[in-house]
Amino acid sequence: MRVNDRNAAMHTRTTAFGFGCKIHVMKTLLVRHATVLATMDALGTEIPDGGLFARDGVIEMVGPTADLPDTADTVLDLRGHVVSPGLVNTHHHLYQSLTRAVPGAQNADLFNWLRTLYPIWGRLTPGAVAVSTQVGLMELARSGCTTASDHLYLFPNGSRLDDQIVAAREVGVRLHASRGSMSLGRSKGGLPPDDSGCRGSMFTFQRD
């Protein structure tokens, strides 16, 4: 987890860190006095009054606060918090974060939900892809997720996978971006309208 905002980290009841990963551009970081540090190892080891020490963005030490260095360039006192390795989200569609509250899609089954939202998703723009990526990744980061695999399969109006990747770099969560495509619109037996960008996704895939 990149610690971009100390205050945000201090007010999050559960703080997650990716073991062995870059977490911020700084010289040293000391996390100490966490109520519990959950290692998530094979034995389920939990360390009371735990913490970690990182140098140049790489975690070097994990253990009881008493066993860690006394100071660092940045020090986080996490009393009342739980520290754990970062969570991994293995399946996401980040662009859908923009359409959660569409009335016609509430309480619908999957196919009717898709039929309702495909026309809206067909109006996605490069900017909308970027914003939805950042909204979704920031929400994941605040809930302890440090890695996400996203499946983007609609590319209308000039949208590209690159738009998502560039936007994700500003957040700091690891992103495994994957590109899908659809070749069948509604007239051919598929779910999305023919003009929703599904055919465009095939053209983009073939072009690249």
Language-model region placement:
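N-terminal metal-binding scaffold of metallo-dependent hydrolase/deaminase domains
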Residues: 22-70, 82
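Aromatic (phenylalanine/tyrosine) cluster motif
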Residues: 17-19
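Metal-coordinating catalytic core of metallo-dependent amide/deamination hydrolases
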Residues: 159-208
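Hydrophobic faces of well-ordered beta-strands that scaffold small-molecule active sites
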Residues: 88-90, 148-150, 175-179
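Alpha-helical scaffold segments that flank or form the walls of functional sites
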Residues: 22, 100-151, 156-173, 208
